[in-house]
Amino acid sequence: MKIKAVAIFLSLLMIISLFSGCVENEKPIKEGSNDFKLIPVNSKSNFEEFKNTVENSIGNYIYVGHSYASREVQITSTVKSSNVETSTEPERFSKTNVQVKGVDEADILKTNGNIIAFSQNKIYLIKPLPPKYAKIIKNISECGYLYLTNNTLIVISWNKITSYNVSNPEMPKIIWQMDLNGSYVDSRLYNGTLYLVVRKNSIDCPIVWNNYKIGYDKYYIPELPPIYSMDFDTTYIISRINIKSGKVENSIAIVGNYKTTLYMSKNNLYFAYNLKINEKKLMLNFLNESADKYFPTEVADKIKRVIENEDFGDNAKFVEITETIERYLSSLPSEKRHNLMKKLQNDFENYLEEHWEEFEYTGIAKINLDSFEVKSGKVSGHLLNNFAMDEYNGYLRVATTIGDWRFRDKMTNNIYILDSDLNVVGKLTGLEKGERIYAVRFMGDKAYIVTYKETDPLLVIDLKNPKNPKVLGELKIPGYSTYLHPIGNNLFIGIGKDDDGKLKISLFNISDLNNPKEVDKYKLNVWWSPAFRDYHAFLWDEKYKIFFLPAYNHAYVFKVEDNKIEMVKDDEHKTNVLRALFINNYLYTFSLSEMHILDENNWQLVKKIEFENYLPYGYGFK
């Protein structure tokens, strides 16, 4: 009977195990307020108290990060000058595909029209004009993410940032260099200023980062609702750096966890991270509120006494209550046990539905670009990526999904609108239950969201009234898009997969917001494109109405005309294609091993340049 009871009890544990991890030694945690906010720690004693709370919560899984010294950079010449060249200035050139026009983002390919910088196993400086005589003129023996503004090339490698003067690209000169003293997370470049986020896998204060002291007044810690986990093991350093001098002009630190998202407008930097519910506490709260419904008085009273005992942490309470329930179940006849289990499961699912918006949060820090003043707020759910946040007319719009693979049928999608103080003033919740967001794009006072389960709903959402967002239209088609790109004339392109898993390009017409349409589509017999996860791989050329899409060793070029998608060029390389750019009327496509130059008027190959000793498995930091 005991064995059989334990076996039946395992089904109850299946419910509970959805909301629990490994049992760790845990002391009682001092709870925060009933809301999320970031506050400066302000004193050593406050910091030590916070650090002890975190260490007790996550089982001391904190380690001290390392600082890496810079290595010497070698700059080598590769090609001598040729007398057949003629000097020419570009009429137009492409910029990196970014989220916010005018706010640059780091990538592996950059141009200012006169030179191209391509980061692979090394940084290649290429003279692109005239196209027939294009050549590699310098190699820099490092690699990383790049910015190229006027004649300044910034390289963010795995352990440092280096700024080069490339006014004479045959003789680039180092202007300044600094150690990252942590791991690179993300960055933006705006108005001659670099905004940088670095992660340190430790919690420590005060911090001196590149001679800038971050004291207790600039070290921000979270205050959380009691039911949320204190799983913080990381410090994020957010800095403003003058790109001319390399001077750190301002810097703050925020304690967070590993999953973060960065979005920057021209006024504010938004730094968001996922806040997970303490899943044991959720179950304990359910039992504390409902134990009288399922158990006799002595069992229910014991459960409540254990929960209310402040001498034990949640893990210890969870173990004791589990054993108490197991003993009670062992005493019941089989049918009664089964009925009780079924009722517990049904009631807990209803409880979860009632508290669904509390299941997970995204904490958001808003950092003013000028003053570095910090404000904070929260929304329910988690973000897909940086396109899930957008600032417009003083409001922050956020798209989230609540739930994960364990709750596929319960997942919901939401839009939240926050004011300048990050208070929620409007929301639209419960969208497309059982699906999750695959793509989102905010454009003006509208949002376009793609969710997916079996079909691809494209939702058009009106955000004109921030306090009352509403769905205007919906389109359901097979497959899904992971990236949406507006191309004007009420059209945008969706890059994703069809229902058979093959790459699909959709052309959407949103001239009738109440009735969006997929006016054309194009399928490729491939499974993957870098643009699925990295929108920097996508390029739109407005002059020729063409877009570039890489897939494996192919650089595909498509033209959009008369609501139709037409492939105009399949530029095949020897290795995986990564990026493209245009200068004047020429398209430059880049793979791991070579660069091709195509004439956009006839799509003929004008020039091919090979890269030596390329990385066979892709680019990366040394």
Swiss-Prot record:
SUPFAM superfamilies assigned: YVTN repeat-like/Quinoprotein amine dehydrogenase
Keyword annotations: Signal
Keyword Transport assigned: no
Keyword Metal-binding part of the UniProt annotation: no
InterPro entries (UniProt xref): Beta_propeller_containing, Quino_amine_DH_bsu, UCP006425_b-propeller
Disulfide bond annotation, renumbered to this chain: none
Segment forming the signal sequence: 1-20
Name of protein: Uncharacterized protein MJ1554
Source taxonomy: Archaea, Methanobacteriati, Methanobacteriota, Methanomada group, Methanococci
